[in-house]
Amino acid sequence: RQMCIRDSFPPIGKATFGTLSDAGDPETGHCRNFEKHIFGTHIAEVEVDTELGTVDVLRYVAVHDCGQVINPMLLTGQIEGGISMGLGQALFEDMKEDPETGRLINNSFTDYLLPTSMDMPLEMKVDFLQTPDEDGPFGALGIGEATPCPVLPAIANAVYNAIGVQIRELPLTPQRVLEYLHKACLLYTSDA
């Protein structure tokens, strides 16, 4: 039996979307703030040590459509910075709080781990498409907030592809990877 998923859940909300009518000043490029959607895709290749639970990102590719690119070097740096930020969220950064007081337990750089240059992929390729945006200044679109978002699923799915176990909690710490591998091994051996 086939059924549309949309029909199996009652609606829980409604959304509306409006577009901008102000195209901006053609000489200066100035225009009002507005919402825009940008598109990109990221691919990660990882190596997972199944004895230690460590995840190393070996290669990484990111491609974004940023409208008209004004400064390619700055744009590349912005995307690489977003990859670094997302890599930290995917593999290391974990806010821990005291359950009684609600205060952060790991509130220093000693306890709250961030990626270093040693954690970054050895091979990283950044590219962009250029579809000029009619509303953006000189046809450009923003990129800053969008670059870390695809990093987390790219790394998590690469880990899934590498070990065959889907981990739906972040960060992918060695302890968490080993815990999920152990659970999967127990499930596999009990089914056999």
Predicted regions mapped to residue ranges:
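C-terminal catalytic domains of large/alpha subunits in multi-subunit enzymes
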Residues: 2, 6-190
